[in-house]
Amino acid sequence: MSVEVLNESGEVPSPCPEQELADLARHVLDQLRVHPRAELTVTLVDERTMSSLHERWMDLPGPTDVMSFPMDELRPGRGDADEDLAEGVLGDVVLCPSVARAQAARAGHAVGDELLLLTTHGILHLLGFDHAEPAEEREMFDLQRTLLLTFLAQRGRTTTAAPEAGRT
């Protein structure tokens, strides 16, 4: 898995270093059986940049927490031994740490947990998951929670981030 994390936000979002975001992304892609040569970029940006992206692509004003920009149409694998998974560029997940920080403060949990949650959320969108309908939302948010909790459990951690966060 090729995962690149770029911090162009001008912030150092502690205690969630870029390496932990990359490790989480690899975990999510591995758990969902995405081709091992798939490529993903996670970019942290400032509010001005996120506002510009949000307006350009969603026609909505102001910054948001996470946006996903799919490239090649990759889907989760089924886990069959003989399955022929597609390889390619999954896409980009763009995070805004200052928005994540405000959301984390309102929700009463750490900004690092919020960034992990938003990264998981963004990757699921790249893989075709959505939350426009109640059944889709339940499926996506249950999977999001499971992926995040299994990642943190492997590290001997828990999260205070609510699984419902990251509704973008």
Language-model regions: role of each:
Residues 118:
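Residues within the DNA-recognition helix of helix-turn-helix
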